[in-house]
Regions:
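Short acidic, Gly/Ser-rich segments with clustered Asp/Glu that frequently serve as metal-coordination loops
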Residues: 18-23
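C-terminal accessory helical subdomains adjacent to catalytic cores in phosphodiester-
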Residues: 1-9, 24-187
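Short, hydrophobic/glycine-enriched beta-strand segments
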Residues: 12-17
């Protein structure tokens, strides 16, 4: 994998379900490695974290109110309020941003198949969707951030098997997950 540190990305908004891992990895990649500007809002914390670096490449990371995919539509008021703050206080143009929903999918979480199918259909484009209401692309994996790390930065992954997302999370924790990001930054 080759990373182009000179590429400008404009504005990108990540909506995640987790409250720690996703924020840490996205920060390490977009701020530590690429030097982009960053705004983060975690649920259950009143403050926003901001790092201004590159005005042409800005990333915002927020999570849903609850750690479950159904919260995308069950609690839209929470995300609407967060989006309002991003627009007004941080001048982050939510409507002109690429929006990605990063959610896990394993046998013990996000098990409502009908709801997942609905989101896959309506959250299909990071900029605009058919319904004209809700932009964003759902990136559903097992678990999403950890799958990215394992598949890109660990050798011989074909020999690994994990039944649940928490198993892969524990595996990454044992091999010091941030050493993987430090390795990337040195490249």
């Amino acid at each position: 994998m080759r990373i182009n540190k000179e590429k400008r990305i404009g504005q990108v908004l990540f909506i995640v379900e987790g409250s720690s891992t996703e924020f840490n990895y996205l920060y390490k990649i977009f701020c530590g490695l690429l030097g982009y500007s960053y705004v983060a809002k975690k649920r259950n914390t009143p403050d926003y974290y901001v790092k201004d670096s590159d005005p042409y490449s800005r990333v915002a990371v927020v999570n849903t109110r609850e750690s479950n995919i159904r919260d995308i539509s069950e609690n839209p008021k929470y995300l609407d309020e967060v989006f309002d703050v991003l627009r007004e206080r941080y001048h982050f143009p939510v409507e002109q941003s690429a929006i990605y929903y990063l959610f896990d999918r394993d046998p013990e979480s996000n098990t409502n198949i009908e709801l997942i199918e609905k989101y896959i259909k309506i959250l299909a484009n990071p900029y605009d969707n058919e319904d004209g209401e809700q932009a964003g692309q759902l990136l559903l994996s097992y678990p999403s951030i950890e799958s990215f790390i394992v598949s890109n930065f660990i050798d011989e992954t074909i020999n690994l098997y994990f039944g649940l997302g928490k198993e892969v999370k524990n595996y990454i924790g044992k091999i010091n997950r941030f050493s993987l990001i430090k390795f990337l930054i040195k490249r």
